[in-house]
């Protein structure tokens, strides 16, 4: 049973990160990648399965009870709202940081992501290197994890704006980077909201 909980937790973390990155990109005023973003939105898994109308007849003739599942769905809906609100807030924070990202850094990252022979690990390293460069130049008036998260999301936005065809690649690279490096912070945000 513990294994199932752990696997579900990882899948849930991935869905939360997907929703966070997607919500951030949706909150951006830049429409140059809107079509690609809409297409990506149709491919993303939902946070929780939809149990609406799921009423199965059991072998004993009774209807199955999904009160627990209904509660999970309701919790997930409120969780989705919380994550979307966090994404909107991070996009607002990102707007104030947007101009601090050098176009040359975005161009270089876009070129690296465009190279299809590079592994996902290489892409994560490329994103990490770009973030390290930005973090060195950025003032420390915000906690490091929040700064890293906002800058990673901003880099995804900037690359997608620069080259809309890279949206899917930069989205998945950003989700993987966040899940590998900022998972605990994102879990905390999802649990506590934006404090």
Swiss-Prot record:
Entry's localization field: Cytoplasm; Mitochondrion membrane; Mitochondrion outer membrane
Main localization (coarse): cytoplasm
Gene Ontology CC: cytosol; membrane; mitochondrial outer membrane; mitochondrion
Keywords: Acetylation, Apoptosis, Cytoplasm, Membrane, Mitochondrion, Mitochondrion outer membrane, Phosphoprotein, Ubl conjugation
Organism encoding this protein: Homo sapiens (Human)
Phosphotyrosine modification, residue list: 54
Record SUPFAM superfamilies: Bcl-2 inhibitors of programmed cell death
Oligomer status and interactors: Forms heterodimers either with the pro-apoptotic protein BAX or the anti-apoptotic protein BCL2. Interacts with PLEKHN1.
Gene Ontology BP term (one): positive regulation of intrinsic apoptotic signaling pathway
Biological role stated in the UniProt entry: Induces caspases and apoptosis. Counters the protective effect of BCL2.
Record comment regarding domains: Intact BH3 motif is required by BIK, BID, BAK, BAD and BAX for their pro-apoptotic activity and for their interaction with anti-apoptotic members of the Bcl-2 family.
PROSITE patterns recorded: BH3
Residues where Phosphoserine is found: 78
Keyword Signal: no
UniProt GO MF annotations: cysteine-type endopeptidase regulator activity involved in apoptotic process; death receptor binding; ubiquitin protein ligase binding
Name used for this protein in its record: BH3-interacting domain death agonist
Site (Cleavage): 60-61, 75-76, 99-100
Chain positions with N-acetylmethionine modification: 1
Transmembrane intervals: none
Intervals of motif BH3: 86-100
Gene: BID
